[in-house]
Amino acid sequence: LETLEIKNPLVCTDPGLSSIGMTDKIRDLISNEISPTFYEETPANPTEKAVNEALELYRANDCDGVVGFGGGSSMDLAKAVALMANHDGNLLDYAVNEGGYGKITETMPMIAIPTTSGTGSEVSVGSLIIMNDGRKLILASPHLMPNAAICDPELTEGLPPVLTAGAGMDALTHCICLLYTSPSPRDLST
């Protein structure tokens, strides 16, 4: 946080991590000079409503950066907040299918702290948001890549087994998908 000159981050996380005390670990790690604000209502699939709520909290507390703490949903929400905190208009203006790729410029500083190992959102340039009308919105830009990712395997300990298994299946699915959809096919026997 200090390297990115973030003094007042918005931490986007979900109710599940809050309920098992994981957000307390973040509070314990942050120095006294940093005043985090927590948005702990990230849904299982981040929504336009959640982005707007988190963005309102970001602005009301004069935040200067974003931390995505949790699974892919929390990190995708953090990316959308980092984008909208530094851009005019609404999310739809920046959707890939609406020509928004080129409109995305520098976002607010962002750190990703994954607690699962499934989506890879901490090292990707994309974010998936469910709009209020049910459409899936894809945001994509190199500017959405987190400035830093803190990958600590100890953060995956203590998660419910079903979540760990689901994240593992997600990672496996990403690998299989890459094999079959890559523009340069590979021999699957190697």
Where are these regions (language model features)?
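N-terminal, positively charged, Ser/Thr/Ala/Gly-biased leader segments
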Residues: 1-9
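Electropositive phosphate-/nucleotide-binding environments in soluble metabolic enzymes
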Residues: 3, 20, 24, 48, ...
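Short beta-strand/turn micro-motifs composed of small residues
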Residues: 13
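Single conserved hydrophobic/aromatic residue that forms the stacking wall/gate
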Residues: 180-190
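Residues at the starts of beta-strands that form the adenosine-phosphate
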Residues: 8, 35, 109
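A glycine/threonine-rich phosphate-anchoring loop and its flanking beta-alpha core
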Residues: 86-179
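N-terminal small/polar loop signature for handling phosphorylated ligands or for N-terminal nucleophile
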Residues: 18-89
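Conserved beta-strand elements of the Class I
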Residues: 10, 65-67, 111
